[in-house]
Curated annotation (Swiss-Prot):
It comes from Gallus gallus. CDD domains: MFS_GLUT_Class1. This is Solute carrier family 2, facilitated glucose transporter member 3. NCBIfam families: SP. Glycans are attached at residue 44.
Amino acid sequence: MADKKKITASLIYAVSVAAIGSLQFGYNTGVINAPEKIIQAFYNRTLSQRSGETISPELLTSLWSLSVAIFSVGGMIGSFSVSLFFNRFGRRNSMLLVNVLAFAGGALMALSKIAKAVEMLIIGRFIIGLFCGLCTGFVPMYISEVSPTSLRGAFGTLNQLGIVVGILVAQIFGLEGIMGTEALWPLLLGFTIVPAVLQCVALLFCPESPRFLLINKMEEEKAQTVLQKLRGTQDVSQDISEMKEESAKMSQEKKATVLELFRSPNYRQPIIISITLQLSQQLSGINAVFYYSTGIFERAGITQPVYATIGAGVVNTVFTVVSLFLVERAGRRTLHLVGLGGMAVCAAVMTIALALKEKWIRYISIVATFGFVALFEIGPGPIPWFIVAELFSQGPRPAAMAVAGCSNWTSNFLVGMLFPYAEKLCGPYVFLIFLVFLLIFFIFTYFKVPETKGRTFEDISRGFEEQVETSSPSSPPIEKNPMVEMNSIEPDKEVA
């Protein structure tokens, strides 16, 4: 089988370098939590010296909330701007260019203490948010386009692995014994410059996406050379043939704008699936679990809950690796269903444990917490990011990634803003809200989400088109082909 290529050093190198962008996203998501009190003291001291008056607790809380939330605002804008870069500059060059934002944001945050400027830190967080928003679109798309069909899901999971490793590194670096101190917190925030430098240098030796070269730039010879290097074989005729077929189809289609994704019947179902899967990630309650984890561990008698939280981060990382090996065996749809269903059970257990407050059940709540995190990384964590790239052909893919990424960042922002109020109103029963969401997303996934394992981009797109033709009253009914049956739990056989 032509798709059963060996895993080459060039392929591993390309996807690993791209995943540094995901690591940046994870690091900058988690880095702000540990030094919260130290940075608030910096805000208080700096603004008091500047105004000559004591800063009110309300203003301090508002400034801190802004510092946290502005990252997501930047992410929303950045993720929605993905399509402006990818077709103009290419996949690799886009990742290279946006590291300028990482340098600027990291420098502003690192120098904010010396400059005694609270504004620098907040603006730096916004710029880093822009950068991370762009990365959440660039990385999964690049990885999906350089990977062979049979390994696309496994390598796509590296995007989520980069995110969770970044969060774990931020948690560890944020410990008081490392960089979570009054003297070193600017370095903790500015450390994001280091992986940016590494990625800039490494990207110079990465190939451009062969799909971009052939389909967008019409440079078949370059695409063939890149494919031969990535696949470790001279015979890449099947890949070239599949790309040419997709290119021919793309030339007959209207330009895929964001509005066209919702107007066109062929794109409407995949974009709704893409948005819903992104919402299933953010509305699953994973952020609430991390919010509650310290309290859960404290009630269980753990004297250093911060280390238990890091333990949850380790579980996060380990089960992302597990997902990497499972996704090409079990399939995307199955793992997403297992993750959502298992998380719903864990959410119910955590609700009971938090409500009863019995000593014996505290330890069950810890198991449920770790189980919730593990199941998140089996399905809802990694799959929504890379399945979007699989559901669309080359033309609409950048616009689809922009819409999906923006919906993820927007829901992340809303959960962050609204969760404290929901927690105050519902107390330990707040997880029931997420339980309802998990069940809704489980039902949606079961009935609407296709299995994409082992299928080419063109085959998946054709499946949606045939569904539209089947459901259209003006079109005669067509016989469903197992290769394009969109709601089948069983994955299709790999393309020979």
